[in-house]
């Protein structure tokens, strides 16, 4: 449906920009790349304040996807300069916990805005965007004043062809396929579960929409508990258990 185009745009641009972002990061540094991602995200959240036309929302979600690609590609390497060893995996998982909270709250903030439960300044459901835009501004300011010593890469930056050639290694290829499957399940559950429940089980819209909320409740809980479990358990064993549960 038309509604499914918007979340798909976010991941489409991640597919396009992930490799070029890695090359950009090698040239300007990890911190500057993350700052750039936050600035692009800020722009994507600013546009809906001026309207909700179809074209404006397409541009907004495209910029959101580009910002997401820049951030996802550069944030983990940047964090590795601060957190090392066994704590890195748990710190990355805790970051997913924060992300899951944002995903869980988004539909409720939009609903509260649409029903005028919270002040919306005549934006209605679009009040969601300036709220998250403020969070982006805070992140930009805090990261900009934070001193991070980045490890310098030795040798020449990798070319686009060299990055693609990594898929020739079985481990890299299997990891790539695994990530695609995981993201597909995540996005598919989020966007299509309510529709399937309405069509197959005859549920009402409110009851079917709760399926998405239930998914994010357990995802949030899983990320939170996982961040602590990974401090005690081997990351490889934890990954195997998580894959089996999926």
Task: Name each model feature, range by range.
Residues 39-52, 244-246:
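C-terminal ends and interior cores of transmembrane alpha-helices
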